[in-house]
Design a protein with these regions (language model features):
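General marker for long, soluble alpha-helical cores
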Residues: 2-143
Length: 143
């Protein structure tokens, strides 16, 4: 039998979110709005297991991200490898980045090699986006 392209496991999603301390109405809404509900609940569980954030914060980040599994991995990797004073900041940055796993690698690598604090590495890596140079055509006159 072929595996389904999506998971429709809304009961497990709700059960995991309730066990994580999410209010029943919030758990029901988050699972109901999700295309892949267990990705949301797994993300929340992963974030809560790795960090000291509020369950509601984890739910907001996980349910509003295109890659909830990577958000949990990002938070987990940063907490495993670095001293973290502000878990909420780590969660916020892992949620804000487009590629959470790559972002975590940047944060850990910069912190370890440049001797930055975790907070400095979070800020440096989130600001290190792609900046194209010498884009043609230029709208500046070449007089």
């Amino acid at each position: 039998a072929q595996a389904q392209a999506t998971d429709f496991d809304y009961d497990n999603c709700a059960s995991e979110l309730l066990a994580a301390g999410i209010a029943p109405d919030a758990a029901a809404a988050a699972c109901a709005m999700s295309y892949r509900p267990t990705e949301i609940s797994s993300c929340v569980s992963g974030v809560l297991n790795a960090s000291a954030v509020l369950p509601e914060s984890a739910l907001v980040a996980c349910s509003r991200d295109r890659r909830p599994d990577e958000v949990a991995t990002c938070v987990s990797n940063i907490h495993a490898d670095l001293v973290v004073n502000d878990s909420e900041m780590v969660l916020e940055h892992c949620h804000r980045t487009i590629l959470p796993e790559r972002y975590a690698a940047c944060v850990v690598g910069i912190a370890n090699e440049v001797d930055y604090t975790t907070e400095d590495s979070l800020t440096t890596c989130i600001a290190a986006g792609y900046k194209p140079l010498d884009i043609e055509p230029s709208y500046i006159p070449l007089d």
